[in-house]
């Protein structure tokens, strides 16, 4: 059974995540004191129910040692996983402005911006040990819920899930990436008027890139690098490995290469997911 601990900065989507987990059959508790986690787990162990608990600055333990002690006292039947949600500073400010809610750390002497920064410092111990960090800056409520369902329900027990995601540098680097590869030096289909409106998922774009030796070399060397270190990553008790491939706009080269890498590791029996940030954004 899984004990999913959901944390993150206020406004990043913890309530949405908790509702999505509840829909997946998790027993969800909002803001349970950390010291009570073992008691909750023991209560649910006999019922064979996975649990999800949110932790934020309101119920953060006074020291990291208290959190570690709670984790060590969990029943053996439970496997703890820490999900940390985040968003860029401007997005958090906009969300608070839209909802007109008060930040948990806001006060007469502390602005919203300062409260967000202070919260980041307080939550850093949890962020640093997270199994999965998700950037929700460009996600809608439904996209976040669907992403969690896909990743959690698609994950096989104790197996590393490899996530290959394409992005455009002009939109910013994904903060949830473990590795970032820049492919802006490769031949660009954008300069072919016929290929410009297409994406890296279309066959003419794939054929264009497939004609270039440097594209083949990059894919081969990147997958060789990942294969070299994958055994150590798999034994490092982590659930996800996110590999981000970036080109200028996130439409052609990065999409094609992310798909090629995903197909390769999928053919080797790995648990693989692919995501294309720019293409998904264009659909909304």
Swiss-Prot record:
ATP binds at residues 8-15. The keyword Protein transport does not apply. It comes from the Bacteria. Transmembrane segments: none annotated. GO terms for molecular function: ATP binding; GTP binding; RNA binding. Residues 266-284 are annotated as: RNA-binding. The keyword tRNA-binding does not apply. GTP binds at residues 56-59. Keywords: ATP-binding, GTP-binding, Nucleotide-binding, RNA-binding. HAMAP family: RapZ_like. Modulates the synthesis of GlmS, by affecting the processing and stability of the regulatory small RNA GlmZ. When glucosamine-6-phosphate (GlcN6P) concentrations are high in the cell, RapZ binds GlmZ and targets it to cleavage by RNase E. Consequently, GlmZ is inactivated and unable to activate GlmS synthesis. Under low GlcN6P concentrations, RapZ is sequestered and inactivated by an other regulatory small RNA, GlmY, preventing GlmZ degradation and leading to synthesis of GlmS. Belongs to the RapZ-like family. RapZ subfamily. PANTHER family: RNASE ADAPTER PROTEIN RAPZ. Homotrimer. This is RNase adapter protein RapZ. The gene is rapZ.
């Amino acid at each position: 059974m899984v004990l999913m601990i959901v944390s993150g900065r206020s406004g990043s989507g913890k309530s949405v995540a908790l509702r999505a987990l509840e829909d997946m059959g998790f027993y969800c508790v909002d803001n349970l004191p950390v010291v009570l986690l073992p008691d909750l787990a023991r209560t649910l162990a006999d019922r064979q129910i996975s649990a999800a608990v949110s932790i934020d600055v309101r119920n953060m333990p006074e020291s990291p040692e208290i959190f570690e002690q709670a984790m060590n006292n969990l029943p053996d039947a439970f496997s703890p996983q820490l999900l940390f949600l985040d968003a860029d500073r401007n997005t958090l400010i906009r969300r608070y402005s839209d909802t007109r809610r008060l930040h948990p750390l806001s006060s007469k002497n502390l602005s919203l911006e300062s409260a967000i920064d202070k919260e980041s410092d307080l939550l850093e111990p949890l962020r640093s040990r997270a199994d999965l960090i998700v950037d929700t800056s460009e996600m809608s409520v439904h996209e976040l819920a669907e992403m969690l369902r896909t990743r959690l329900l698609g994950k096989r027990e104790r197996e590393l899930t490899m996530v290959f995601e394409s992005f455009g540098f002009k939109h910013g680097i994904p903060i949830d990436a473990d590795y970032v590869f820049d492919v802006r030096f490769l031949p660009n289909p954008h300069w072919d008027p016929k290929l410009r409106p297409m994406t890296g998922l279309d066959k003419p774009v794939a054929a264009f890139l497939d004609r270039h030796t440097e594209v083949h070399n990059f894919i081969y060397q990147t997958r060789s690098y990942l294969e070299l270190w994958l055994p150590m990553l798999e034994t490092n008790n982590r659930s996800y490995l996110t590999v981000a491939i970036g080109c200028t706009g996130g439409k052609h080269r990065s999409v094609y290469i992310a798909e090629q890498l995903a197909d390769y590791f999928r053919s080797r029996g790995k648990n693989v997911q692919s995501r294309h940030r720019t293409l998904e954004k264009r659909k909304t």
